[in-house]
Every structure is written in structure tokens, then in C-alpha cells.
Amino acid sequence: MVAKRLGFRRDEALTLGRAVASLNAYSKGVSLGLFRPSPKSLKERRKKLMRGRRLKVDVLRRAVPVTRTPDGLRALSGGRPISPASVQRYLQDKFGDCLAPARAAMRGLARSAPPKTLAASGYTLYVKFRPSVAAGVKGWGARGKLDLNLIRRLTKTSRSRNS
């Protein structure tokens, strides 16, 4: 929702959101000792192997690698464009019947602040409503409950601050 509010088309926003989620998950995995960052030389070799022009887009204070495709910008994962359809399937699988209400609540929150404010404070908002899971490795990959009423309350608070 943040990328859409910042002016990206729906398909572009889906891939950017997925990339941000993956980058955040990877960072948490590194902090828990589950992953080791790849050596700089390996990263440089990977960059040289990637075809097409790469750009970076700032979403929620994350530099997301993207490329232009005939269908618009696509965030990259493993050097390849993320498919918006695969993101949609993933969301449908994870949220099921709750996807539409969750999307509506998040859309309301995204619209409650001007784009510049949202770009600067979107991650802080997310931290306030993200589902809680067990701390440390126990919580890695665990499912939490998304509190839509909390998101709606944050929307009201944000609207009153930004009006």
C-alpha cells in the first residue's frame, strides 16, 4: 500500500512490497544468526551477471533493486523481476478470506498521511501493527494475528495528526 500511495502502479507496488518484506526478513535472519551476509566480492560478481539496467527505489527506507520491463518497474529478487501474479497468489494464500478487509484497512492507513510523511514514517507505523510472534529464533517464520482494529485506530490517529 505504501508504494501505491507513493505513486507506483498496482503491479509495481506489489513487487516492491514483496521485495521490502524479503529484505526485512533477511535482515532479521542475519540478526538472529540464521543467515550470513554474502561476501562483498560475491555481491559484485552477481551484479555483473545481471542483465538489463538496474535501478534502486527507496520504499520504507529500503533501497529496493528494480528493473524496467515492458509492463513497468519490477522489484528484483535474486536478480530476476518479481511476478506481480506470484505476489498476489502469496497474499491470497496467507490471508485467505481476510485479504480484502486487510487490504482495505492498510489502504486507509496509507491514505491517512501525505505521501512524503508516509514515506518517512511508514515503517514506524508498520512496527506498531505488525503481528507479534515469539522473540528470537522461536518467532522466525511464525504466524501472528494481524489486528485490523489496531490498524483502523492508527488510521484515525494519523488522520487527526495530518489534518
Which residues fall in each region the model found?
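Solvent-exposed interaction surfaces and binding hotspots enriched for charged
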Residues: M1-S163
